[in-house]
Design a protein with these regions (language model features):
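SAM-dependent transferase fold signal centered on methyltransferase-like domains
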Residues: 1-381
């Protein structure tokens, strides 16, 4: 009983016996779903046809369990999908839509930012000329995820001082601006003009819920659209100085300060933070050695900006949340060594490492590392 495309196995049963059949199914299969809710139930004048969700080798089992109590037939019919049916997996949504040769290209994960899904195809060589396959996979993502309205494909690595990547529209609405909800905060952003990754959700929650004291002065040196700053100020009565070089990120940062009900305050700056100290300007003079805590979420090159951090942090000590990409193996140990060497060159020392961890594997050769360290100026004790 081999199935053709768009066919399924159905139980054909007399209408007057349909209710008894349903009861027997529930009794004999209490923990299994054997009726397929993807397809419409069919009926004619005398019979009802129930679509089955079991493999051919289980049909005899069904006959043995229910057949003695009830007369029915197993037949093949063209299956019509229910209009309100919601696919649970991409594989299910793509069944019969793409060749099985491309099943290995269906992504196991993808980012969802607001109403936009962002997908990356691992085997780009195989997919380069397969626009139709990409489009079908993208449409399947929209089918599986209720809130997704658009799908974009990553077309480059994150690059440049603004940390942006090229994207290509695959399916759904065209538009790169969205509202993203995270940890009781709302972030307005543009996926092409600003940097944002939902994969640091847990890390941002950890930092925002850490032991931050009332009245702290905090510098967020690479604030982006405010993902760290807003979440911290949402929970704590603090003053945050949030810097970003990208004018679009700065625009959205200001909007996100307004749309979130904050306990603390955030002062945004659109500036290259190197310009705080080369030469010193009014902002740096105001903040020099007055900052209690510094966030350095720029893993590609954060160590190069530790001169700015050491210039701002209190000489008697403060906390730096430093993020870096570090080579495997022993990536944490190597990251700490690089961090220590760099701050010592500015006459600071590590008094305590409060946390050091692998945030994620960034590539086959490197990890993304976080170091939460209390540092102070030499000769303070």
């Amino acid at each position: 009983m081999r199935l053709k495309n768009n066919q399924a196995y159905f139980v054909k049963i007399a209408k007057k016996k349909a209710q008894k059949f349903i009861k027997l199914v529930k009794k004999n299969y209490p923990k299994r779903i054997i009726l397929h809710n993807k397809y419409q139930i069919v009926e004619d004048n005398h019979y009802i046809f129930f679509p089955l969700k079991i493999s051919p080798d289980k049909i005899n089992e069904l006959r043995k369990k229910i057949g003695p109590s009830l007369e029915f037939e197993i037949i093949k019919l063209k299956a019509e999908k229910r209009e309100n049916y919601e696919h649970r997996t991409l594989e299910e949504a793509l069944k019969g839509q793409i060749s099985k040769n491309y099943y290995d290209l269906i992504p196991h994960s993808y980012d969802i930012i607001g109403e936009i899904a962002i997908i990356e195809f691992k085997n780009n060589e195989k997919m380069k000329k397969k626009r139709k396959v990409k489009n079908k996979i993208a449409k399947a993502i929209i089918q599986v995820n209720k809130n997704v309205k658009s799908v974009y494909e990553k077309k480059s690595k994150v690059r440049g001082a603004f940390r942006l990547r090229k994207m290509a529209h695959l399916a759904g609405l065209k538009g790169t601006e969205t509202l993203h909800k995270e940890n009781d905060c709302i972030f307005k952003l543009d996926i092409i003009r600003t940097f944002f990754t939902p994969r640091l959700n847990h890390e941002r929650l950890l930092v925002s819920k850490s032991n931050i004291e009332k009245g702290e002065r905090i510098a967020d040196l690479f604030a982006g659209v405010g993902t760290f700053s807003v979440q911290i100020a949402k929970l704590h009565d603090v003053k945050i100085y949030a810097f970003d070089i990208n004018p679009y990120a700065y625009k959205y940062l200001k909007e996100n300060i307004k749309i979130n009900n904050l306990k603390g305050s955030i002062i945004p700056f659109n500036i290259n933070i190197k310009k705080l100290i080369n030469p010193p300007n009014q902002i740096e003079i105001q903040l020099r050695n007055k900052i209690d805590r510094i966030i350095m979420n720029f893993p590609e090159d954060s160590l190069r900006f530790l001169d700015v951090a050491c210039n701002l942090i209190k000489e008697e000590g403060g906390i730096i949340h430093n993020y870096q990409f570090s080579e495997k193996p022993n990536s944490i140990k190597k990251a700490i060594a690089k961090f220590r060497n760099e701050i010592e060159s500015y006459n600071f020392i590590i008094k305590e490492i409060k946390r050091s961890d692998i945030i994620k594997s960034y590539s086959p050769k490197s990890d993304m590392i976080v170091i939460d360290a209390f540092i102070e100026k030499l000769n303070q004790s």
